[in-house]
């Protein structure tokens, strides 16, 4: 990738992330954010940031969130709350995760088609309905799986078995049902 191509890709990612963050903050400021789910994730990440068990009073008195869904990857978000302990930080994390998922898509497409088509593929991804729906629905842990899955496909395509294995293990920390997604990826790779 040339410097110019890298700058173009970075500009697209920064623009998308900025739009996602702006949309997320506007939803929060106008009381459009889904208080139930956002409240749960805010409490859980806040507890992790304080080195406490991930309890959520939104789910119930002393409700341990890992009893609802298994998503220990949320503990990795604690440092973000050390910087700014606010539910809107989850909107920033979501925007960064979605934008980061475009990098392996670009690398995958560029190897096959060239810079222009790869950049168009990234733009299409960042503007796609699934991404817009995720941004419009506030933070959910599954959003963290998007870049991991994208990098996993890139690693498999490049026959980077150890990296793919590590990414597959990391994907399992996103949510308990990501094993089904890994099964689908394995079936596609076997064909």
Which sequence ranges carry the predicted segments?
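Juxtamembrane segments of multi-pass membrane glycosylation machinery
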Residues: 50, 69-93
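Specific aromatic-rich, kink-prone transmembrane helix
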Residues: 100, 104-107, 124, 143-168, ...
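Transmembrane-helix motifs of polytopic, lipid-linked glycan transferases
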Residues: 88-112
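Helix-to-loop transition at the C-terminal end of transmembrane segments
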Residues: 18-39
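Start-transfer (signal-anchor) and selected internal transmembrane alpha helices
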Residues: 1-21
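Extracytosolic helix-loop segments that constitute the early lumenal/periplasmic catalytic or substrate-binding loops
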Residues: 25, 40-64, 72-73
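Short helix- or helix-capping micro-motifs
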Residues: 118-129, 168-172
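Short acidic/glycine- and proline-prone juxtamembrane loop motifs at membrane-interface regions
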Residues: 134-142
């Amino acid at each position: 990738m040339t410097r110019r191509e890298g700058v173009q890709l970075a500009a697209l990612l920064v623009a998308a992330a900025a739009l996602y963050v702006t949309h997320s903050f506007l939803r929060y400021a106008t009381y459009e954010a889904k208080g139930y789910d956002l409240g749960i994730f805010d409490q859980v990440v806040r507890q992790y940031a304080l080195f406490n068990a991930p309890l959520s009073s939104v789910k119930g008195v002393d409700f341990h969130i890992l009893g609802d869904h298994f998503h220990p990857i949320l503990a990795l978000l604690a440092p973000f709350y050390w910087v700014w302990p606010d539910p809107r930080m989850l909107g920033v994390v979501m925007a960064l995760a979605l934008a980061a998922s475009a990098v392996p898509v670009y690398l995958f497409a560029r190897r096959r088609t060239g810079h222009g088509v790869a950049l168009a593929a990234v733009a299409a991804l960042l503007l796609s309905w699934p991404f817009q729906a995720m941004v419009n629905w506030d933070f959910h842990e599954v959003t963290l799986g998007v870049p991991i899955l994208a990098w996993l496909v890139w690693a498999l395509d490049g026959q980077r078995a150890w990296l793919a294995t590590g990414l597959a293990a990391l994907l399992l920390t996103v949510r308990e049902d990501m094993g089904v997604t890994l099964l689908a990826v394995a079936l596609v790779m076997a064909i």
